[in-house]
């Protein structure tokens, strides 16, 4: 469930328990004294009610490069009426210049320490899980997944992202038998299970003090069975206990659920559509907005969404964000246009599939072909309206399928090569960091992006992003805009932090002029990347604030669409 994993770990810039890191090379290990038998009990397993006093709080501070980057708390609440043991966690990760990222969790265990149910919640997403026979079922309310869970057949632990109490529970419930314990580790944050193992590299007589090197790269210090510290050399991460911790006051509300409802004065009908495609490609779903009372075929719009995965309404996330495209498409339908809007693969009712840039171009082509054969649509008056990076897909459609696209509207579209855009975005974020950590952050960012683009040292779970980047980096927007031979509109807000309102517009404008392409440019002071009013500085956090798409922008877009789709006297082409 990659969307859930993204949401629950959103903004986490550290690697800790539950987030995989390659183990560092083992050097200078001390040899544990005493009995090295494989069945020697170095830490006795105990039941969940024997590990903590009711209400006891455990607190941990997370540091990276010697600086505090967050805290993790956990506590034992006691037994409920069903005899299940309840544990709670709170996580707070801090980032310079940004609000803290907070999450909460709850865990119910039976008397044997086996998982019963629980949840992990952040402002981005809520993931609930429960044991069902030999499986753990995860759901975010829209998607459901399950992983095998058979603790009676093989030792199995469970852990949520940055929940250090869960790590302490893991050692307390499983115990340590022999120098190399091993068990299966289930992520409660939506990640894939992993095989976990460790080596006891140091211990004192009586095993009151143990140091354990794990296969995930952590060096864990246990004192009387409790975590006293964790070190991750590869990321300069350290975790230390907080003396006399108190339970944090913050709470996390369940994230909002975004839903579209037809406007009360809607003058259009809605018809569900499937977008036909090759049998080996995922099924795609969308809907056609059909103006009521239209006399004969009407002009039509295909809306192409921007970066990231969105549903047909422009709802993205986690965290749940209303990007506002439904306001644009509703207005077009309300004013006489048939509109096709569709779910990106893996969103809404569209099936998941590999998310490469070229695959997304093909998906837009499927939508265009589907729109053209609808009986209410005039195939000679189809325009494509594309937002953000979706504009690159729109440009490719307009050049490769010139006969099918009558006009093209580019809303906040990059004009420079996308690699330049991404690196500029990263540099802007780095400049907001404290001066003492900028160079390290800049080097880490450069290495990460270089590795993704080249395919070097790319974790399996990031392979799709690497493919997408390689494909989109090959696109030259300025070259494409010069080859388009239909009317184009370029709209740009001057509060956009994703696209440079000057450099990107200039690149497209100059290329169109040099090649004789028809490009009308409209600039909108005070509007952000989503064409919503922004009184201050735009940021990802500001996208979470409920705002409407600007009325004047929508009015201009409607006027342009009417003008470029005015009926022409040329013969109508056959649908065959």
Give the residues covered by each predicted segment.
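Accessory cap/linker subdomain of secreted extracellular hydrolases
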Residues: 401, 407-483, 498
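Alpha/beta-hydrolase active-site loop
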Residues: 324, 354-375
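Short beta-strand/loop motif that positions the catalytic acidic residue
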Residues: 484, 490-492
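N-terminal cap/lid segment of alpha/beta-hydrolase-fold proteins
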Residues: 255-296
């Amino acid at each position: 469930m990659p969307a859930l994993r993204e949401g629950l770990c959103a903004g986490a810039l550290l690697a800790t328990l539950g987030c995989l890191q390659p183990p560092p090379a083992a050097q200078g290990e001390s040899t544990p004294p005493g009995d090295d038998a494989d069945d020697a009990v170095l830490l006795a397993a105990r039941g969940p009610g024997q590990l903590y006093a009711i209400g006891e709080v455990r607190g941990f501070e997370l540091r990276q490069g010697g600086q505090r980057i967050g805290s993790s708390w956990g506590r034992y609440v006691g037994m409920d009426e069903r005899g299940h043991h309840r544990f709670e966690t709170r996580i707070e990760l801090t980032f310079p210049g940004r609000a803290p990222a907070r999450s909460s969790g709850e865990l119910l265990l039976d008397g044997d320490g086996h998982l019963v149910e629980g949840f992990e919640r952040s402002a981005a997403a809520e993931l609930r899980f429960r044991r069902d026979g030999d499986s753990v079922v995860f759901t975010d309310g829209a998607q459901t997944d399950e992983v095998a869970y058979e603790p009676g057949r093989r030792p199995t632990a469970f852990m949520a992202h940055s929940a250090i109490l869960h790590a302490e529970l893991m050692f307390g419930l499983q115990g340590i038998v022999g120098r190399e314990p091993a068990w299966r580790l289930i992520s409660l944050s939506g990640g894939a299970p992993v095989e976990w193992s460790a080596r006891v590299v140091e211990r004192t007589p009586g095993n009151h003090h143990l140091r354990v090197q794990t296969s995930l790269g952590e060096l864990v210090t246990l004192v009387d069975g409790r975590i006293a510290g964790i070190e991750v050399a590869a990321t300069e991460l350290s975790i230390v206990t907080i003396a006399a911790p108190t339970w944090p006051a913050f709470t996390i509300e369940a994230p909002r659920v975004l839903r579209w409802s037809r406007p009360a004065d809607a003058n259009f009908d809605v018809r569900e559509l499937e977008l036909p495609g090759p049998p080996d490609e995922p099924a795609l779903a969308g809907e056609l907005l059909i103006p009521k009372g239209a006399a004969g075929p009407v002009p039509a719009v295909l809306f192409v969404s921007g970066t990231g995965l969105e549903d047909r309404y422009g709802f993205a996330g986690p965290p749940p964000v209303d990007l506002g495209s439904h306001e644009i498409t509703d207005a077009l339908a309300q004013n006489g246009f048939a509109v096709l809007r569709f779910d990106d693969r893996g969103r809404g009712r569209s099936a998941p599939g590999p998310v490469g840039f070229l695959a997304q171009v093909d998906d837009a082509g499927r939508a265009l072909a589907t729109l053209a054969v609808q009986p209410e649509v005039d195939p000679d008056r189809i325009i494509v309206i594309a937002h953000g990076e979706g504009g690159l897909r729109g440009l490719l459609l307009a050049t490769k399928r010139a006969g099918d696209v009558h006009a093209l509207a580019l809303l906040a579209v990059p004009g420079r090569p996308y690699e330049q855009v991404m690196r500029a975005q990263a540099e802007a974020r780095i400049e907001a960091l404290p001066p003492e950590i900028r160079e390290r952050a800049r080097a880490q960012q450069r290495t990460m992006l270089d590795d993704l683009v080249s395919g070097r040292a790319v974790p399996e779970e990031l392979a799709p992003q690497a493919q997408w980047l390689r494909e989109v980096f090959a696109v030259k927007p300025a070259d494409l805009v010069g080859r388009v031979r239909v009317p184009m509109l370029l709209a740009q807000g001057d509060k956009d932090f994703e696209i440079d309102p000057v450099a990107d517009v200039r690149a497209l404008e100059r290329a169109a002029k040099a090649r004789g392409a028809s490009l009308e440019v409209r600039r909108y002071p005070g509007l952000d990347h989503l064409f919503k009013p922004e009184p201050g500085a735009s940021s990802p956090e500001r996208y979470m604030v409920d705002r409407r798409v600007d009325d004047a922008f929508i009015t201009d877009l409607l006027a342009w669409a009417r003008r470029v789709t005015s009926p022409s006297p040329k013969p109508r082409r056959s649908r065959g």
